[in-house]
Amino acid sequence: SKEVMKSLSINFSKPLEVXKQEMGLQDAVMQDFYN
């Protein structure tokens, strides 16, 4: 059903957003480290 897919995509995208934020932080730290 659409509701199931909707909840699945929401539950999947939340950790994905967190991971992207963490990767962004790591990238910023590495850039600061090299500069």
Curated annotation (Swiss-Prot):
Tissue: Antenna.
GO annotation (BP), single: response to pheromone
GO molecular function terms listed in the Swiss-Prot or TrEMBL record: pheromone binding
Quaternary structure (record): Homodimer.
Family in the record: Belongs to the PBP/GOBP family.
Stated role: This major soluble protein in olfactory sensilla of male moths might serve to solubilize the extremely hydrophobic pheromone molecules and to transport pheromone through the aqueous lymph to receptors located on olfactory cilia.
Descriptive protein name: Pheromone-binding protein
Source organism (scientific name): Orgyia pseudotsugata (Douglas-fir tussock moth)
